[in-house]
């Protein structure tokens, strides 16, 4: 049984039954590469194998033929901080190579531009983009890098389809508010956001194809508190009309109270509101430098078209630098590897709180590091979405 570190309890039970009565089992695996807990994989099965089968003969394959000495040693320094693993010492017949490069960048765009320029130099020196990979913890984090590659027409291939943030209902809600502020008071648009946040407006009150706030006031004329809410909405739309997209999104989130609605929505759906806020951060970031709603809408259309073109190209031929999550790159190797956003909250992921979860995050980072044959870059940012970001604790372990 190969890749035994990824086995789950049900699979193990089946294998044990098949191995009876002679208990004849040959397994191969690397406990440091067990990264599929979300699929049910349990590295403890491999770690406890000798207890289940006393007298097991263990053979340690301790030579790494892929990485340079510098890359291998850096990865081993880091993974040794995991407590639940087989202690092992690996060596490589390869050259010492260049030290692992830890890069501090100010913002995600600067990080992406740094990678772009280095890739361009790599190609100018005779390297092939197919022998380079840019890795992220999650698919969504690849967005900035993909934008830069499309902007500078550098070919890339992506294993996963990058979601278009502008197709998300959160973005449609923001647009609904901004279009209403510009005078588009269609019933469909108004219904979408009239209770986001909750204003207690009923659908029965919205019966016209084009909504009139004056008609709404007449409908609720006997409820002064409802008229006050409609007056407030009208005032908010007037303010919104004068704002550029970045300020408008910020006002919808904090002034109108859209984030308040998202908190209630997340609690009702039993999901984390932080993930919705992160999407809003990404959407708001894209409005920087936009002077008008029309300009932003043109940008959104252009972005969507570029994503479709990229998907069409990829379906015909796969070439260029690989953009991938750490999970999807397991088993592959590249001459040059860049791991981006090596920050707390990304690597390790923000949901990893328990020691067991942190150990899996460390294994995942180890898998990413050991994809590199000759050159490895570990990049982190100091700021994102106008907030400070902390570099990953794993970088300290790599260095020391």
Question: Residue ranges of each PLM-predicted region?
Answer:
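Conserved helicase NTPase motor core
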Residues: 1-47, 63-67, 331
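Short glycine-/polar-rich loops that comprise or flank the Walker A/P-loop
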Residues: 21-24, 30-32, 53-58, 96-100, ...
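Conserved nucleotide-binding/hydrolysis micro-motifs of P-loop NTPases
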Residues: 31-35, 40-44, 64-69, 109, ...
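Proline-centered turn/helix-capping motifs that create local helix->coil transitions or kinks
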Residues: 23, 78-88, 245, 290-295
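ATPase/helicase motor core of nucleic-acid motors
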Residues: 95-98, 125-248, 267-271
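Conserved helicase core region in the C-terminal RecA-like lobe
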Residues: 3, 28, 138, 295-349, ...
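Helicase P-loop NTPase motor core
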Residues: 54-57, 62-155, 182-183
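Accessory C-terminal helicase-associated subdomains
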Residues: 222-328, 349, 375
């Amino acid at each position: 049984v190969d890749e035994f570190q990824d086995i789950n309890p049900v699979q193990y039970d089946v294998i044990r039954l098949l191995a009876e009565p002679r208990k004849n089992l040959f397994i191969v695996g690397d406990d440091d590469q067990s990264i599929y807990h979300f699929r049910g994989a349990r590295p403890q099965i491999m770690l406890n194998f000798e207890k289940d089968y006393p007298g097991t003969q263990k053979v340690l394959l301790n030579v790494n033929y892929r990485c340079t000495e510098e890359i291998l040693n850096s990865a081993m320094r880091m993974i040794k901080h995991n407590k639940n693993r087989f202690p092992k010492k690996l060596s490589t017949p390869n050259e010492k190579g260049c030290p692992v490069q830890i890069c501090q960048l100010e913002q995600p765009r600067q990080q992406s531009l740094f990678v772009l320029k280095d890739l361009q130099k790599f190609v100018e020196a005779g390297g092939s983009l197919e022998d380079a990979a840019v890795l992220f913890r999650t698919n969504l984090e690849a967005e900035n890098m993909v934008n830069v590659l499309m902007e500078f027409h550098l070919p890339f291939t992506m294993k996963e389809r990058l979601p278009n943030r502008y197709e998300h209902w959160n973005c449609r809600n923001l647009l609904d508010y901004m279009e209403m502020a510009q005078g588009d008071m269609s019933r469909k648009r108004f219904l979408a956001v009239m209770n986001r946040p909750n204003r207690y407006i009923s659908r029965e009150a919205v019966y016209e194809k084009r909504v009139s706030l004056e008609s709404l006031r007449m409908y609720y004329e006997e409820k002064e508190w409802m008229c006050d809410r409609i007056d407030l909405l009208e005032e908010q739309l007037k303010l919104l009309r004068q704002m550029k997209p970045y300020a408008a999104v910020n006002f919808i989130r904090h002034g109108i109270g859209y984030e308040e609605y998202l908190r209630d929505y997340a609690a009702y759906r039993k999901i984390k509101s932080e993930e919705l806020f992160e999407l809003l951060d990404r959407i708001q970031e894209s409005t920087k430098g936009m002077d008008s709603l029309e300009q932003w809408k043109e940008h959104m259309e252009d972005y969507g078209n570029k994503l479709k073109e990229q998907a069409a190209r990829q379906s015909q031929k796969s070439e260029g630098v690989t953009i991938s999550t750490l999970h999807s790159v397991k088993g592959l190797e590249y001459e040059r590897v860049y791991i981006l956003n090596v920050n707390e909250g990304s690597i390790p992921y923000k949901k990893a709180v328990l020691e067991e979860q942190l150990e899996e995050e460390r294994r995942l980072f180890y898998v990413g590091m050991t994809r590199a044959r000759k050159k490895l870059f570990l990049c982190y940012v100091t700021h994102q979405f106008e907030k400070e970001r902390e570099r990953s604790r794993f970088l300290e372990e790599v260095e020391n």
